[in-house]
Design a protein with these regions (language model features):
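Helix-breaking motifs and short loop linkers at transmembrane-helix boundaries and internal kinks
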Residues: 9, 41, 62-67, 230, ...
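Cytoplasmic helix-loop-helix junction between adjacent transmembrane helices
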Residues: 72-106
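Symmetry-related core transmembrane helices of the 12-TM Major Facilitator Superfamily/SLC fold
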Residues: 130-151, 355-373
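Extracytoplasmic gate region of multi-pass secondary transporters
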Residues: 197-241, 245-249
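C-terminal transmembrane helical hairpin of 12-TM major facilitator-type secondary transporters
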Residues: 261-309
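A late C-terminal transmembrane helix in Major Facilitator Superfamily
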Residues: 316-353
Protein backbone atom coordinates (compact mmCIF):
# COMPACT_ATOMS: atom_id res chain seq x y z
CA UNK A 1 0.00 0.00 0.00
CA UNK A 2 2.90 2.36 0.69
CA UNK A 3 4.18 1.79 -2.87
CA UNK A 4 0.74 2.52 -4.33
CA UNK A 5 0.46 5.63 -2.17
CA UNK A 6 3.70 7.06 -3.56
CA UNK A 7 2.82 6.27 -7.18
CA UNK A 8 -0.72 7.66 -6.98
CA UNK A 9 0.10 10.65 -4.82
CA UNK A 10 -2.47 9.73 -2.18
CA UNK A 11 -1.99 9.37 1.60
CA UNK A 12 -1.85 5.81 2.94
CA UNK A 13 -4.82 6.62 5.19
CA UNK A 14 -7.02 6.98 2.10
CA UNK A 15 -6.87 3.20 1.66
CA UNK A 16 -9.69 3.08 4.19
CA UNK A 17 -11.94 4.81 1.66
CA UNK A 18 -11.39 2.01 -0.84
CA UNK A 19 -12.21 -0.58 1.82
CA UNK A 20 -15.40 1.29 2.74
CA UNK A 21 -16.61 1.39 -0.88
CA UNK A 22 -15.86 -2.33 -1.32
CA UNK A 23 -17.66 -3.20 1.91
CA UNK A 24 -20.69 -1.11 0.92
CA UNK A 25 -20.83 -2.90 -2.43
CA UNK A 26 -20.63 -6.33 -0.83
CA UNK A 27 -23.46 -5.50 1.57
CA UNK A 28 -25.71 -4.21 -1.23
CA UNK A 29 -25.12 -7.21 -3.52
CA UNK A 30 -25.51 -9.68 -0.65
CA UNK A 31 -28.88 -8.17 0.24
CA UNK A 32 -29.92 -8.36 -3.44
CA UNK A 33 -28.78 -11.97 -3.84
CA UNK A 34 -32.20 -13.56 -3.33
CA UNK A 35 -33.76 -11.40 -6.05
CA UNK A 36 -30.82 -11.91 -8.45
CA UNK A 37 -30.60 -15.67 -7.92
CA UNK A 38 -34.34 -16.12 -8.41
CA UNK A 39 -34.12 -14.26 -11.71
CA UNK A 40 -30.85 -15.55 -13.18
CA UNK A 41 -29.90 -18.68 -11.20
CA UNK A 42 -26.93 -19.30 -8.93
CA UNK A 43 -24.56 -20.29 -11.75
CA UNK A 44 -25.04 -17.11 -13.78
CA UNK A 45 -24.91 -14.88 -10.70
CA UNK A 46 -21.64 -16.53 -9.61
CA UNK A 47 -20.08 -16.23 -13.09
CA UNK A 48 -21.10 -12.58 -13.48
CA UNK A 49 -19.89 -11.77 -9.97
CA UNK A 50 -16.47 -13.30 -10.58
CA UNK A 51 -16.30 -11.43 -13.91
CA UNK A 52 -16.98 -8.18 -12.05
CA UNK A 53 -14.11 -8.84 -9.65
CA UNK A 54 -11.82 -9.67 -12.59
CA UNK A 55 -12.79 -6.39 -14.28
CA UNK A 56 -12.22 -4.47 -11.06
CA UNK A 57 -8.80 -6.01 -10.42
CA UNK A 58 -7.71 -5.24 -13.98
CA UNK A 59 -9.00 -1.71 -13.45
CA UNK A 60 -6.92 -1.44 -10.27
CA UNK A 61 -3.84 -2.45 -12.26
CA UNK A 62 -4.42 0.36 -14.78
CA UNK A 63 -5.50 3.04 -12.31
CA UNK A 64 -3.65 6.35 -12.81
CA UNK A 65 -5.13 7.94 -9.68
CA UNK A 66 -6.78 7.22 -6.34
CA UNK A 67 -10.22 8.13 -7.65
CA UNK A 68 -10.02 5.49 -10.38
CA UNK A 69 -9.34 2.95 -7.62
CA UNK A 70 -12.50 4.17 -5.89
CA UNK A 71 -14.43 3.77 -9.16
CA UNK A 72 -13.32 0.16 -9.66
CA UNK A 73 -13.92 -0.62 -5.99
CA UNK A 74 -17.65 -0.50 -6.78
CA UNK A 75 -17.75 -3.53 -9.15
CA UNK A 76 -15.25 -5.31 -6.92
CA UNK A 77 -17.56 -5.02 -3.91
CA UNK A 78 -20.67 -5.92 -5.89
CA UNK A 79 -18.95 -8.97 -7.36
CA UNK A 80 -17.49 -10.15 -4.05
CA UNK A 81 -20.84 -9.96 -2.26
CA UNK A 82 -22.68 -11.62 -5.12
CA UNK A 83 -20.39 -14.63 -5.38
CA UNK A 84 -20.30 -15.09 -1.61
CA UNK A 85 -24.08 -15.22 -1.23
CA UNK A 86 -24.94 -17.21 -4.36
CA UNK A 87 -22.13 -19.78 -4.16
CA UNK A 88 -22.45 -20.38 -0.41
CA UNK A 89 -26.17 -21.05 -0.66
CA UNK A 90 -25.75 -23.30 -3.71
CA UNK A 91 -23.12 -25.41 -1.95
CA UNK A 92 -25.21 -25.52 1.25
CA UNK A 93 -28.16 -26.96 -0.68
CA UNK A 94 -26.43 -29.25 -3.17
CA UNK A 95 -23.32 -30.48 -1.35
CA UNK A 96 -22.35 -31.90 2.02
CA UNK A 97 -20.76 -30.16 4.98
CA UNK A 98 -17.22 -31.32 4.22
CA UNK A 99 -17.47 -29.73 0.77
CA UNK A 100 -18.41 -26.43 2.42
CA UNK A 101 -15.45 -26.65 4.81
CA UNK A 102 -13.03 -27.34 1.99
CA UNK A 103 -14.54 -24.53 -0.09
CA UNK A 104 -13.76 -22.08 2.70
CA UNK A 105 -10.32 -23.59 3.20
CA UNK A 106 -9.64 -22.49 -0.38
CA UNK A 107 -10.50 -18.95 0.74
CA UNK A 108 -7.71 -19.18 3.29
CA UNK A 109 -5.26 -20.50 0.71
CA UNK A 110 -6.24 -17.67 -1.64
CA UNK A 111 -5.87 -15.08 1.10
CA UNK A 112 -2.37 -16.39 1.85
CA UNK A 113 -1.42 -16.62 -1.84
CA UNK A 114 -2.46 -13.11 -2.87
CA UNK A 115 0.29 -11.29 -0.92
CA UNK A 116 2.89 -13.67 -2.37
CA UNK A 117 1.77 -12.82 -5.91
CA UNK A 118 2.01 -9.12 -5.13
CA UNK A 119 5.40 -9.67 -3.49
CA UNK A 120 6.63 -11.50 -6.59
CA UNK A 121 5.62 -8.60 -8.82
CA UNK A 122 7.30 -6.06 -6.54
CA UNK A 123 10.51 -8.09 -6.17
CA UNK A 124 10.66 -8.57 -9.94
CA UNK A 125 10.55 -4.81 -10.40
CA UNK A 126 7.19 -4.96 -12.18
CA UNK A 127 5.38 -2.78 -9.65
CA UNK A 128 2.11 -3.18 -7.79
CA UNK A 129 0.08 -2.82 -11.01
CA UNK A 130 1.34 -6.17 -12.29
CA UNK A 131 0.47 -7.80 -8.98
CA UNK A 132 -3.18 -6.86 -9.52
CA UNK A 133 -2.91 -7.81 -13.19
CA UNK A 134 -1.71 -11.33 -12.37
CA UNK A 135 -4.61 -11.85 -9.98
CA UNK A 136 -7.09 -10.42 -12.50
CA UNK A 137 -5.84 -12.94 -15.10
CA UNK A 138 -6.54 -15.76 -12.64
CA UNK A 139 -10.05 -14.35 -12.12
CA UNK A 140 -10.62 -14.14 -15.89
CA UNK A 141 -9.64 -17.81 -16.24
CA UNK A 142 -12.00 -18.68 -13.38
CA UNK A 143 -14.80 -16.73 -15.08
CA UNK A 144 -14.28 -18.73 -18.27
CA UNK A 145 -14.40 -22.00 -16.32
CA UNK A 146 -17.64 -20.93 -14.63
CA UNK A 147 -19.24 -19.97 -17.94
CA UNK A 148 -18.36 -23.30 -19.54
CA UNK A 149 -19.61 -25.16 -16.46
CA UNK A 150 -23.04 -23.47 -16.35
CA UNK A 151 -24.87 -26.57 -17.69
CA UNK A 152 -23.47 -28.59 -14.76
CA UNK A 153 -25.14 -26.29 -12.21
CA UNK A 154 -28.55 -27.46 -13.38
CA UNK A 155 -27.65 -31.14 -13.01
CA UNK A 156 -27.07 -31.05 -9.26
CA UNK A 157 -29.90 -32.16 -6.99
CA UNK A 158 -30.26 -30.99 -3.38
CA UNK A 159 -28.52 -33.03 -0.70
CA UNK A 160 -30.96 -34.42 1.89
CA UNK A 161 -29.96 -32.81 5.16
CA UNK A 162 -30.79 -33.36 8.80
CA UNK A 163 -29.36 -31.59 11.77
CA UNK A 164 -29.74 -34.52 14.10
CA UNK A 165 -29.38 -37.74 12.12
CA UNK A 166 -28.24 -39.12 8.80
CA UNK A 167 -31.15 -39.77 6.38
CA UNK A 168 -32.10 -43.25 5.34
CA UNK A 169 -31.60 -44.47 1.78
CA UNK A 170 -35.34 -44.14 1.05
CA UNK A 171 -35.42 -40.53 2.22
CA UNK A 172 -32.28 -39.77 0.22
CA UNK A 173 -33.85 -41.12 -2.99
CA UNK A 174 -37.09 -39.27 -2.34
CA UNK A 175 -35.30 -35.98 -1.69
CA UNK A 176 -33.19 -36.41 -4.81
CA UNK A 177 -36.29 -37.02 -6.88
CA UNK A 178 -37.95 -33.93 -5.42
CA UNK A 179 -34.83 -31.93 -6.20
CA UNK A 180 -35.43 -32.51 -9.92
CA UNK A 181 -38.83 -30.86 -9.74
CA UNK A 182 -39.25 -27.25 -10.80
CA UNK A 183 -39.13 -24.89 -7.81
CA UNK A 184 -42.42 -22.99 -7.49
CA UNK A 185 -42.22 -19.29 -8.29
CA UNK A 186 -42.17 -16.93 -5.32
CA UNK A 187 -41.47 -13.34 -4.51
CA UNK A 188 -38.00 -12.54 -3.14
CA UNK A 189 -37.85 -12.08 0.61
CA UNK A 190 -36.89 -8.61 1.74
CA UNK A 191 -35.13 -7.65 4.96
CA UNK A 192 -38.41 -7.52 6.87
CA UNK A 193 -39.44 -10.88 5.49
CA UNK A 194 -36.19 -12.49 6.64
CA UNK A 195 -36.32 -10.93 10.10
CA UNK A 196 -39.87 -12.23 10.56
CA UNK A 197 -38.70 -15.84 10.16
CA UNK A 198 -38.38 -17.70 13.44
CA UNK A 199 -34.69 -18.12 14.33
CA UNK A 200 -33.39 -15.79 11.61
CA UNK A 201 -32.35 -13.02 14.01
CA UNK A 202 -30.30 -15.48 16.05
CA UNK A 203 -28.38 -16.86 13.09
CA UNK A 204 -27.71 -13.33 11.77
CA UNK A 205 -26.35 -12.17 15.13
CA UNK A 206 -24.21 -15.32 15.23
CA UNK A 207 -22.69 -14.38 11.90
CA UNK A 208 -22.08 -10.80 12.97
CA UNK A 209 -20.33 -11.97 16.14
CA UNK A 210 -18.22 -14.59 14.39
CA UNK A 211 -16.93 -12.19 11.74
CA UNK A 212 -16.34 -9.47 14.33
CA UNK A 213 -14.24 -11.94 16.35
CA UNK A 214 -12.35 -13.27 13.32
CA UNK A 215 -11.49 -9.89 11.81
CA UNK A 216 -10.55 -8.35 15.15
CA UNK A 217 -8.19 -11.25 15.82
CA UNK A 218 -6.79 -11.06 12.29
CA UNK A 219 -6.15 -7.30 12.39
CA UNK A 220 -5.11 -6.77 16.02
CA UNK A 221 -3.22 -9.94 17.01
CA UNK A 222 0.20 -8.63 15.97
CA UNK A 223 -0.39 -5.27 17.69
CA UNK A 224 -1.51 -7.07 20.85
CA UNK A 225 1.67 -9.15 20.83
CA UNK A 226 3.93 -6.16 20.17
CA UNK A 227 2.30 -3.49 22.34
CA UNK A 228 0.66 -5.65 24.98
CA UNK A 229 3.20 -8.43 25.38
CA UNK A 230 6.42 -6.69 24.35
CA UNK A 231 7.22 -9.04 21.47
CA UNK A 232 9.40 -7.67 18.67
CA UNK A 233 7.21 -6.25 15.87
CA UNK A 234 8.64 -8.49 13.15
CA UNK A 235 8.29 -11.57 15.34
CA UNK A 236 4.79 -10.52 16.38
CA UNK A 237 3.69 -10.22 12.75
CA UNK A 238 5.08 -13.67 12.00
CA UNK A 239 3.36 -15.31 14.97
CA UNK A 240 0.09 -13.47 14.27
CA UNK A 241 -0.07 -15.20 10.89
CA UNK A 242 -0.63 -18.43 12.83
CA UNK A 243 -4.23 -17.33 13.31
CA UNK A 244 -4.92 -17.39 9.54
CA UNK A 245 -2.93 -20.59 9.18
CA UNK A 246 -5.00 -22.11 12.00
CA UNK A 247 -8.24 -21.25 10.19
CA UNK A 248 -7.06 -22.64 6.86
CA UNK A 249 -5.57 -25.86 8.26
CA UNK A 250 -8.55 -26.22 10.57
CA UNK A 251 -11.00 -26.09 7.67
CA UNK A 252 -9.05 -28.67 5.72
CA UNK A 253 -9.14 -30.97 8.76
CA UNK A 254 -12.70 -30.17 9.83
CA UNK A 255 -13.90 -31.26 6.40
CA UNK A 256 -13.01 -34.80 7.44
CA UNK A 257 -14.46 -34.36 10.94
CA UNK A 258 -17.83 -33.26 9.50
CA UNK A 259 -18.16 -36.76 8.05
CA UNK A 260 -18.58 -37.95 11.65
CA UNK A 261 -20.33 -35.02 13.38
CA UNK A 262 -23.24 -32.82 12.31
CA UNK A 263 -23.13 -29.05 11.84
CA UNK A 264 -24.36 -27.97 15.32
CA UNK A 265 -21.81 -30.25 16.99
CA UNK A 266 -19.04 -28.84 14.80
CA UNK A 267 -20.08 -25.30 15.69
CA UNK A 268 -20.04 -26.12 19.41
CA UNK A 269 -16.66 -27.82 19.12
CA UNK A 270 -15.32 -24.73 17.38
CA UNK A 271 -16.70 -22.45 20.08
CA UNK A 272 -15.10 -24.58 22.80
CA UNK A 273 -11.74 -24.41 20.99
CA UNK A 274 -11.98 -20.62 20.68
CA UNK A 275 -12.67 -20.36 24.41
CA UNK A 276 -9.78 -22.72 25.17
CA UNK A 277 -7.50 -20.65 22.96
CA UNK A 278 -8.42 -17.42 24.75
CA UNK A 279 -7.82 -19.08 28.13
CA UNK A 280 -4.38 -20.25 26.96
CA UNK A 281 -3.61 -16.71 25.77
CA UNK A 282 -4.25 -15.44 29.30
CA UNK A 283 -1.93 -17.98 30.96
CA UNK A 284 1.41 -16.55 32.16
CA UNK A 285 3.54 -19.09 30.28
CA UNK A 286 7.24 -18.43 29.58
CA UNK A 287 8.47 -17.00 26.26
CA UNK A 288 4.95 -15.77 25.47
CA UNK A 289 4.07 -19.38 24.64
CA UNK A 290 0.51 -18.94 25.88
CA UNK A 291 -0.16 -16.03 23.54
CA UNK A 292 1.32 -17.78 20.51
CA UNK A 293 -0.28 -21.20 21.05
CA UNK A 294 -3.56 -19.69 22.20
CA UNK A 295 -3.90 -17.58 19.08
CA UNK A 296 -3.43 -20.60 16.84
CA UNK A 297 -6.01 -22.57 18.86
CA UNK A 298 -8.44 -19.67 18.42
CA UNK A 299 -7.87 -19.94 14.66
CA UNK A 300 -8.48 -23.70 14.74
CA UNK A 301 -11.69 -23.07 16.68
CA UNK A 302 -12.89 -20.48 14.19
CA UNK A 303 -12.36 -22.92 11.31
CA UNK A 304 -15.62 -24.94 11.38
CA UNK A 305 -17.99 -22.21 12.58
CA UNK A 306 -18.44 -20.10 9.43
CA UNK A 307 -18.92 -22.97 6.92
CA UNK A 308 -21.10 -25.05 9.25
CA UNK A 309 -23.44 -22.15 10.05
CA UNK A 310 -23.96 -21.56 6.33
CA UNK A 311 -24.39 -25.27 5.56
CA UNK A 312 -27.03 -25.66 8.28
CA UNK A 313 -29.11 -22.72 7.01
CA UNK A 314 -31.22 -24.61 4.41
CA UNK A 315 -31.88 -27.32 6.99
CA UNK A 316 -33.13 -24.85 9.59
CA UNK A 317 -35.19 -22.63 7.31
CA UNK A 318 -35.86 -24.55 4.09
CA UNK A 319 -34.27 -24.24 0.67
CA UNK A 320 -36.89 -21.70 -0.46
CA UNK A 321 -35.79 -19.24 2.22
CA UNK A 322 -32.10 -20.04 2.50
CA UNK A 323 -30.84 -17.74 -0.29
CA UNK A 324 -32.39 -14.68 1.32
CA UNK A 325 -31.05 -15.66 4.74
CA UNK A 326 -27.56 -16.48 3.44
CA UNK A 327 -27.52 -13.10 1.70
CA UNK A 328 -28.40 -11.43 5.00
CA UNK A 329 -25.71 -13.51 6.72
CA UNK A 330 -23.11 -12.19 4.27
CA UNK A 331 -24.30 -8.62 4.87
CA UNK A 332 -24.03 -9.11 8.65
CA UNK A 333 -20.59 -10.63 8.14
CA UNK A 334 -19.36 -7.58 6.26
CA UNK A 335 -20.84 -5.18 8.82
CA UNK A 336 -19.20 -7.06 11.68
CA UNK A 337 -15.87 -7.25 9.85
CA UNK A 338 -15.96 -3.56 8.94
CA UNK A 339 -17.20 -2.02 12.20
CA UNK A 340 -15.97 -4.06 15.15
CA UNK A 341 -12.16 -4.03 14.64
CA UNK A 342 -12.15 -0.18 14.64
CA UNK A 343 -14.18 -0.25 17.86
CA UNK A 344 -11.42 -2.28 19.48
CA UNK A 345 -8.94 0.23 18.08
CA UNK A 346 -10.67 2.92 20.13
CA UNK A 347 -10.55 0.68 23.20
CA UNK A 348 -6.84 0.00 22.64
CA UNK A 349 -6.13 3.70 22.23
CA UNK A 350 -8.17 5.07 25.10
CA UNK A 351 -8.12 2.17 27.60
CA UNK A 352 -5.58 -0.62 26.97
CA UNK A 353 -4.76 -3.16 24.27
CA UNK A 354 -4.48 -5.83 26.99
CA UNK A 355 -8.27 -6.17 26.74
CA UNK A 356 -7.87 -7.89 23.35
CA UNK A 357 -8.66 -11.46 24.59
CA UNK A 358 -11.64 -10.22 26.59
CA UNK A 359 -13.00 -8.38 23.56
CA UNK A 360 -12.96 -11.70 21.69
CA UNK A 361 -14.74 -13.38 24.62
CA UNK A 362 -17.62 -10.89 24.43
CA UNK A 363 -18.42 -11.90 20.85
CA UNK A 364 -17.84 -15.58 21.61
CA UNK A 365 -20.32 -15.57 24.51
CA UNK A 366 -22.96 -13.75 22.46
CA UNK A 367 -22.39 -16.19 19.60
CA UNK A 368 -22.88 -19.18 21.92
CA UNK A 369 -26.08 -17.69 23.38
CA UNK A 370 -27.51 -17.06 19.90
CA UNK A 371 -26.60 -20.56 18.69
CA UNK A 372 -28.28 -22.25 21.63
CA UNK A 373 -31.34 -20.02 21.19
CA UNK A 374 -31.45 -20.98 17.51
CA UNK A 375 -31.29 -24.66 18.43
CA UNK A 376 -34.14 -24.28 20.91
CA UNK A 377 -36.33 -22.46 18.41
CA UNK A 378 -35.59 -24.50 15.30
CA UNK A 379 -34.11 -27.79 16.53
CA UNK A 380 -33.54 -30.25 13.72
CA UNK A 381 -36.71 -29.37 11.86
CA UNK A 382 -37.03 -27.20 8.82
CA UNK A 383 -39.12 -24.10 9.36
CA UNK A 384 -41.90 -23.93 6.85
Amino acid sequence: MATMSADLGAPVSWAGGISMVISAGTIVSALMSDRMTLRFGAGKVTAISVALTALALFGFSMAPSYWVLILFAVPYGLGAGGVDAALNNYVAIHYESHHMSWLHAMWGIGALTGPYIMGYALNAGQGWSWGYRYISILQIVLTAILIFSLPLWKQRVPQPQSIETEPSADITEQSAAEGLAQEPSREPLGIRGVLAIRGAREILIMFFCYCALEQTAMLWASSYMALGKGIDKTTAAMWASLFCIGITVGRLLSGFVTMKFNDPTMIRMGQVLVLLGVVVMLLPLPQHLGTIVGLMVVGLGCAPIYPCVIHSTPTYFGEDKSQAIVGMQMACAYVGSMCMPPVFGLIAQHVTIILFPWYLVVFLVLMIVMHESLRRKCGGQRIG
